[in-house]
């Protein structure tokens, strides 16, 4: 049985938000998700909002936004760098069965761009 290997660091252009340097990118076959850890460079800009980062990553990775969840964004005081951990699931159903409720809510819920009724 082979051990999943980490891919080499690569750069992801995130438009106005800056750019990300992927440090770890591997597929977890047990959970059926891709786990990405990256350094987000956003010099002279605020830390990006989760929903905007999630939308841009969905566009760049070519997957549905319902399959992507930002686990954390950690930014040092005054730094234009943030460490970001992202989970990209094979299906939205798997994401909902593994991600804690508070993470789903932090990421804008199940349908992040659906308007609230009422």
Curated annotation (Swiss-Prot):
Organism the protein comes from: Aeropyrum pernix (strain ATCC 700893 / DSM 11879 / JCM 9820 / NBRC 100138 / K1)
Family annotation (InterPro entries): eRP_eS24_sf, Ribosomal_eS24, Ribosomal_eS24_CS, Ribosomal_uL23/eL15/eS24_sf
UniProt cross-references to SUPFAM superfamilies, sorted A to Z: Ribosomal proteins S24e, L23 and L15e (SSF54189)
Pfam family, any one: Ribosomal_S24e
HAMAP family cross-referenced by the UniProt entry: Ribosomal_eS24
GO cellular component: ribonucleoprotein complex; ribosome
Similarity comment: family membership: Belongs to the eukaryotic ribosomal protein eS24 family.
Signal peptide (residue range): none
GO molecular function terms attached to this record: structural constituent of ribosome
Family annotation (PANTHER family): 40S RIBOSOMAL PROTEIN S24
Protein name (database record): Small ribosomal subunit protein eS24
